[in-house]
Design a protein with these regions (language model features):
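Intrinsically disordered, charged low-complexity linkers and terminal tails
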Residues: 1-210
Length: 210
């Protein structure tokens, strides 16, 4: 069993508040009581956020289309996104560039990465994750320095540890494997892709605030 009793109780409480709509990861993140949330993420095997589709299936909450996705390459891809190691937000920024506001790109150019990277780190205090002392120092980083950072950190590690879903492609900085070209058009995958990115960034900053 993945979800412990506290997590299940919270899930159904939040689902009732949402008029019986299946909660997203972000719904749960925002609405779970703190003790229950911390209990949920304390042990990997009980952390529903690292295996949300499996959790929904276990609880009888997965619809037929999501079940097909879960048992196919799309489900494997989403699980990689849920579980990839994350010491900083860098990987999530690259994933945001792929996500492209719901119009998923199969490959990223320098410009694709720079646009999302600079926008993300210019927002609020996100620039602090780059290890600079001030916002002015952030503004002084050149495009080539940003790209070097992206290449040697998130891009390198996604290529190495992305279970083959992230690949090199001539003329691009990084690409998705061809086996994903059809599934990335799925509204269900798009929904979960965006939800995972938003949750993982939110959880990262929650942890960092303590």
């Amino acid at each position: 069993m993945i979800a412990n009793s506290w997590t299940r109780s919270e899930y159904y409480r939040i689902k009732a508040i949402l008029d019986e709509k299946i909660p997203t990861r972000m719904d749960l993140f925002k609405m779970m009581n703190v003790p229950q949330y911390l209990s949920c993420i304390e042990k990997s095997r009980e952390n529903i956020f690292k295996q949300y589709l499996d959790t929904l299936e276990e609880m009888g909450e997965l619809d037929a289309e999501e079940l097909v996705l879960k048992n196919d390459v799309g489900g494997e891809f989403l699980h990689v996104l849920e579980t990839t190691l994350m010491q900083k937000t860098y990987k999530m920024v690259i994933l945001k560039a792929f996500f492209n506001n719901g119009n998923i790109k199969m490959a990223l150019t320098e410009k694709d990465i720079l646009d999302v990277w600079k926008d993300f780190f210019a927002e609020g205090d996100n620039w602090k994750d780059l290890g600079v002392e001030s916002y002015q120092d952030f503004l002084g980083i050149t495009d080539e320095q940003h790209l070097t950072n992206a290449r040697k950190n998130p891009i390198k590690h996604l290529l190495l540890s992305g279970q083959g879903f992230f690949v090199e492609r001539p003329g691009y900085e990084i690409a998705l494997a061809e086996e994903l070209k059809d599934v990335v058009k799925s509204d269900i995958l798009i929904k979960h892709f965006g939800d995972i990115i938003e949750y993982r960034i939110s959880e990262y900053f929650r942890k960092k605030s303590f």
